From Swiss-Prot:
Residues holding Mg(2+): D72, E140
Molecular function, one GO term: glutaminase activity
Enzyme class: ligase
Gene symbol of the encoding locus: pyrG
Catalytic activity: UTP + L-glutamine + ATP + H2O = CTP + L-glutamate + ADP + phosphate + 2 H(+); L-glutamine + H2O = L-glutamate + NH4(+); UTP + NH4(+) + ATP = CTP + ADP + phosphate + 2 H(+)
Keywords annotated in UniProt: ATP-binding, Glutamine amidotransferase, Ligase, Magnesium, Metal-binding, Nucleotide-binding, Pyrimidine biosynthesis
Gene3D superfamilies, per the entry: 3.40.50.880, P-loop containing nucleotide triphosphate hydrolases
Annotated residues for binding of ATP: S15, L16, G17, K18, G19, I20, D72, K239, D240, V241
Organism for this UniProt entry: Salmonella schwarzengrund (strain CVM19633)
Protein's name according to its UniProt entry: CTP synthase
Known role: Catalyzes the ATP-dependent amination of UTP to CTP with either L-glutamine or ammonia as the source of nitrogen. Regulates intracellular CTP levels through interactions with the four ribonucleotide triphosphates.
Domain Glutamine amidotransferase type-1: start-end pairs: 291-542
Similarity section: Belongs to the CTP synthase family.
Regulation of activity: Allosterically activated by GTP, when glutamine is the substrate; GTP has no effect on the reaction when ammonia is the substrate. The allosteric effector GTP functions by stabilizing the protein conformation that binds the tetrahedral intermediate(s) formed during glutamine hydrolysis. Inhibited by the product CTP, via allosteric rather than competitive inhibition.
C-alpha cells in the first residue's frame, strides 16, 4: 500500500489555523472512505510540552498511549476517528535527544554529526514511521515559514517529497490575505512574499489556503495563482466562520478534496458530511442555554483548557442547549469570596498544578456541595473536592494534599509511589523524580460501582479513560471520609487507586481523577459532560420555579 503525504505549512503570521485546516481536510478525506491520520512537528527544543507553562503553550493533550502532546492533536481527534499516539507528535528537542543518544552509543561510526543529513534523516524516519498503514497522512509543521527553528523540518519534508516521489506528496501552505478598510480590498502581497520564502527553501506549494476575515474574491485568487505558480482551482479561500465545524464543508465546497484525490490518483466515493451538517444544525438551533462557571488558575489563556471548553460545548450539543462558559480565576474566589459564583447553573474545576489559587478551588467545591449546584471536578478538581469534604464533613481539620503541604496532619491526597502502566509494568516514583514524563499517563481501566451515578451515565461497569497526574487519594485515610458519606464510585482496574467520587445526597456532584475531556468529540460527545450539562439545565429550571 502506498501512503500519500500532505505537508502543511504556514506563512506571514502565526495562529492562522493550520491545525484546524489540516483536521478539516482530514475529516473530508475520511468521509470519502480513506484511512487518514495527522502529524504535528513542533520546532521548539523542549522534548515534549509536558513541563511547559499552560499560559505560554496552552493545554497538554494526552494520547491513549500516554504521550504528552500539542493541543492540535486534540483538534485532530475531534475531527477524525483515528486515535493519535506518540508517533503523531514530535519536537526538535526529541529529534536532537535521539540523535545525540545514537552519537554517544557510536551508531554513526565516528562521522561528524550534522543537521544534514543526521537531523533531517531522523525527522524523515519519524514521519515515515507515523504514516505507516494509512492512505493519506497530513503533516503539520509548527511555526511560520521564515522562522530559524523550522528550517530543519522544512528541509526534511523537501527531501522526503523527492524520496517518496512527487506523485505521492503535496505541499499545502496557509497564508494571510488581509483586508485593508482604507483601500476597500484584500491584499495579496503578503502571500506572494510568503511563497517566495518557501521557494527559497526549495518548496513549491501545490495548494494555497488563503485566510481572511471574508471570502477572497475570484479575481484576487486568480492573481495569487498567477504570481505563486499554483493552479487557480488550488487557491482556496478560508474565511472566518462562527463555528470551526463549518470548515470541512467550506473546503469541500471549493473542491479541495477532489483536487487532492486526482493528484494522488485515489479512487474513492464522494464525501458524506451529513454528520458534520447535523453538528452544525444542533449548534445553530439550541432549545435553551446554561451558564457554567469554570474555576481555574490559567484562565488568561483559554487554550490552557481547550479540550474542556470543547467538551462542554459537545455536552451542550447532546442536550440541545448553548453552553455559556464563565472563566473564573480561583484567586478571585479567595479574595472576593464565593459571591462571584452566584447565578451559575453548574460549576467545573479542571486539572492544574501548584498551590496558587487552590484554597479558592476548595471554597468553590464547598459552595457547590452546600448549595446543591451541579459540580464536575477533573483531576485536581477531584482532589480539592475530596479535601473540602474531609475538612468540612469528615471532621479532618486542615486536611490537604502533600503537593501543597507536605507535612499536613491529614494528607488525604498524596504522591502515587507505585502503579502499573498501560503495558502492565510497575512504575515507581518519588519526590525526587524528574517532572517531565513521570506522571501516571494515558488510558487506564476503571471499574464503576453498581449503585453510582456514573454507572448510569456510562451504561457500563468498566470504562477506559486517559490520565495525567502524580497525586492520588490516600487510601490510608479513605475509610474515615467514606464513613462521613462520600461515595467512591470508581476504582482503577487493580482496585488500588480511587478514580471517581460522588456526593450521594446531592443532585449532581461527580469528580474524577482522569481527564474525560480528551475523548469527547462533537459527533459523539462524552457521557460525563452530557450528564453534567443536563444537570445544569435541570438546576436552572429548579431555580426558575
Amino acid at each position: 500500500m502506498t501512503t500519500n503525504y500532505i505537508f502543511v505549512t504556514g506563512g506571514v503570521v502565526s495562529s492562522l489555523g493550520k491545525g484546524i485546516a489540516a483536521a478539516s481536510l482530514a475529516a473530508i478525506l475520511e468521509a470519502r472512505g480513506l484511512n487518514v491520520t495527522i502529524m504535528k512537528l513542533d520546532p521548539y527544543i523542549n522534548v515534549d510540552p509536558g513541563t511547559m507553562s499552560p499560559i505560554q503553550h496552552g493545554e497538554v493533550f494526552v494520547t491513549e498511549d500516554g504521550a504528552e502532546t500539542d493541543l492540535d492533536l486534540g483538534h485532530y481527534e475531534r475531527f477524525i476517528r483515528t486515535k493519535m499516539s506518540r508517533r503523531n507528535n514530535f519536537t526538535t528537542g526529541r529529534i536532537y535527544s535521539d540523535v545525540l543518544r545514537k552519537e554517544r552509543r557510536g551508531d554513526y561510526l565516528g562521522a561528524t554529526v550534522q543537521v544534514i543529513p543526521h537531523i533531517t534523516n531522523a525527522i524523515k524516519e519519524r514521519v515515515l514511521e507515523g504514516g505507516e498503514g494509512h492512505d493519506v497522512v497530513l503533516v503539520e509543521i509548527g511555526g511560520t515559514v521564515g522562522d530559524i527553528e523550522s528550517l530543519p523540518f522544512l528541509e526534511a519534508i523537501r527531501q522526503l517529497a523527492v524520496d517518496i516521489g512527487r506523485e505521492h506528496a503535496l505541499f499545502m501552505h496557509l497564508t494571510l490575505v488581509p483586508y485593508l478598510a482604507a483601500a476597500g480590498e484584500v491584499k495579496t502581497k503578503p502571500t506572494q512574499h510568503s511563497v517566495k520564502e518557501l521557494l527559497s527553501i526549495g518548496i513549491q506549494p501545490d495548494i494555497l489556503i488563503c485566510r481572511s476575515d471574508r471570502a477572497v474574491p475570484a479575481n484576487e485568487r486568480a492573481k495569487i495563482a498567477l504570481f505563486c505558480n499554483v493552479p487557480e482551482k488550488a487557491v482556496i479561500s478560508m474565511k472566518d466562520v462562527d463555528s470551526i465545524y463549518k470548515i470541512p464543508g467550506l473546503l469541500k465546497s471549493q473542491g479541495l478534496d477532489d483536487y487532492i484525490c486526482k493528484r494522488f490518483s485515489l479512487n474513492c466515493p464522494e464525501a458524506n458530511l451529513s454528520e458534520w451538517e447535523q453538528v452544525i444544525y444542533e449548534e445553530a438551533n439550541p432549545a435553551g442555554e446554561v451558564t457554567i462557571g469554570m474555576v481555574g488558575k490559567y484562565i488568561e489563556l483559554p487554550d490552557a483548557y481547550k479540550s474542556v471548553i470543547e467538551a462542554l460545548k459537545h455536552g451542550g450539543l447532546k442536550n440541545r442547549v448553548t453552553v455559556n462558559i464563565k472563566l473564573i480565576d480561583s484567586q478571585d474566589v479567595e479574595t472576593r469570596g464565593v459571591e462571584i459564583l452566584k447565578d451559575l447553573d453548574a460549576i467545573l474545576i479542571p486539572g492544574g498544578f501548584g498551590y496558587r489559587g487552590v484554597e479558592g478551588k476548595i471554597a468553590t467545591a464547598r459552595y457547590a456541595r452546600e448549595n446543591n449546584i451541579p459540580y464536575l471536578g477533573i483531576c485536581l478538581g477531584m482532589q480539592v473536592a475530596l479535601i473540602e469534604f474531609a475538612r468540612n464533613v469528615a471532621g479532618m481539620d486542615n486536611a490537604n494534599s502533600t503537593e501543597f503541604v507536605p507535612d499536613c496532619k491529614y494528607p488525604v491526597v498524596a504522591l502515587i509511589t507505585e502503579w502499573r502502566d498501560e503495558d502492565g509494568n510497575v512504575e515507581v516514583r518519588s519526590e525526587k523524580s524528574d517532572l517531565g514524563g513521570t506522571m501516571r499517563l494515558g488510558a487506564q481501566q476503571c471499574q464503576l460501582s453498581d449503585d453510582s451515578l456514573v454507572r448510569q451515565l456510562y451504561g457500563a461497569s468498566t470504562i477506559v479513560e486517559r490520565h495525567r497526574h502524580r497525586y492520588e487519594v490516600n487510601n490510608m485515610l479513605l475509610k474515615q471520609i467514606e464513613a462521613a458519606g462520600l461515595r467512591v464510585a470508581g476504582r482503577s482496574g487493580d482496585d488500588q487507586l480511587v478514580e471517581i467520587i460522588e456526593v450521594p445526597n446531592h443532585p449532581w456532584f461527580v469528580a474524577c481523577q482522569f481527564h474525560p475531556e480528551f475523548t469527547s468529540t462533537p459527533r459523539d460527545g462524552h457521557p460525563l459532560f452530557a450528564g453534567f450539562v443536563k444537570a445544569a439545565s435541570e438546576h436552572q429550571k429548579r431555580q426558575a420555579k
